[in-house]
């Protein structure tokens, strides 16, 4: 099982405080959906890979649809609001010594809104555990 955990809420924090970028706001919290941001700056994530369920995360081989455009066939969501880890991949069988591929995709989109200038950091911890 592969999980992700955001070290802050919101996940994308502006250095020096203030002006943080809010987590993506899907129609149903913590439920992946097609990326849709209107008049806001938001930060969300998706996943692709061998053991990443496409029913949950969508289907694409790349994180982006084009320059600065999140994939339109992946499903995106916010980080867990309760502070627990988010599962992105799992396998019922043992992987080979080479392992399997899993990629966390991130998107930050501004639609008619400008984020405050400065440096931003998102600390995301990925944890792989044996079932």
What does each model-found stretch correspond to?
Residues 1-131:
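Signature of Gram-negative chaperone-usher
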């Amino acid at each position: 099982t592969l999980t992700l955990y955001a070290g802050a809420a919101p996940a994308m924090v502006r250095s020096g405080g203030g002006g943080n970028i809010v987590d993506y706001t899907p129609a149903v919290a913590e439920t992946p959906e097609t990326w849709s941001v209107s008049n806001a700056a938001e930060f969300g994530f998706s996943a692709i890979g061998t053991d990443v369920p496409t029913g949950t995360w969508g289907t694409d081989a790349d994180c982006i649809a084009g320059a600065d455009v999140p994939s339109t066939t992946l499903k995106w969501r916010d980080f867990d609001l309760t502070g627990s880890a988010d599962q992105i991949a799992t396998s019922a069988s043992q992987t080979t010594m080479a392992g399997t591929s899993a990629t966390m995709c991130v998107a930050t989109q501004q639609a008619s809104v400008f984020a405050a200038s400065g440096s931003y950091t998102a600390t995301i911890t990925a944890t792989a555990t044996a079932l």
